[in-house]
């Protein structure tokens, strides 16, 4: 399943998101959700322990001035990669 986090993790039921993640799922951080990719925050630590890959939309990282502050555990992607993720996963959950 592809999970997409559009909102800031501080304004989301992040505990519910973590509970619903399964091995093999992927999470895409976009819009204000990219703030979860900033190195050293508590949400990133929780994502590191999840059995998933985490991506962040590069355009949103740039728009928020976060490109130099994200963790190496986060994979920056462009819109083409975003489309590939949506094609890969038949089911999606937006947060």
Swiss-Prot record:
A matching Pfam family: DsrH
Function: Part of a sulfur-relay system required for 2-thiolation of 5-methylaminomethyl-2-thiouridine (mnm(5)s(2)U) at tRNA wobble positions.
Quaternary data: Heterohexamer, formed by a dimer of trimers. The hexameric TusBCD complex contains 2 copies each of TusB, TusC and TusD. The TusBCD complex interacts with TusE.
Family: Belongs to the DsrH/TusB family.
InterPro entries: DsrEFH-like (IPR027396), Sulphur_relay_TusB (IPR023526), Sulphur_relay_TusB/DsrH (IPR007215)
Protein's name according to its UniProt entry: Protein TusB
Main subcellular location of this protein, as a coarse class: cytoplasm
PANTHER family named in the record: PROTEIN TUSB
GO BP annotations listed: tRNA wobble position uridine thiolation
Domain of life of the source: Bacteria
Subcellular location: Cytoplasm
Organism lineage string: Bacteria, Pseudomonadati, Pseudomonadota, Gammaproteobacteria, Enterobacterales
Keywords in alphabetical order: Cytoplasm, tRNA processing
GO cellular-component term (any): sulfurtransferase complex
């Amino acid at each position: 399943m592809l999970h997409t986090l559009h909102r800031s993790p501080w304004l989301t039921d992040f505990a519910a998101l973590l509970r619903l993640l399964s091995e093999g799922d992927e999470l895409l951080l976009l819009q204000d959700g990219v703030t979860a990719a900033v190195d050293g925050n508590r949400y990133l630590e929780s994502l590191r322990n999840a059995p998933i890959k985490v991506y962040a939309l590069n355009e949103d990282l740039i728009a928020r001035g976060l490109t130099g502050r994200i963790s190496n555990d986060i994979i920056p992607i462009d819109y083409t990669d975003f489309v590939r993720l949506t094609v890969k996963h038949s089911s999606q959950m937006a947060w």
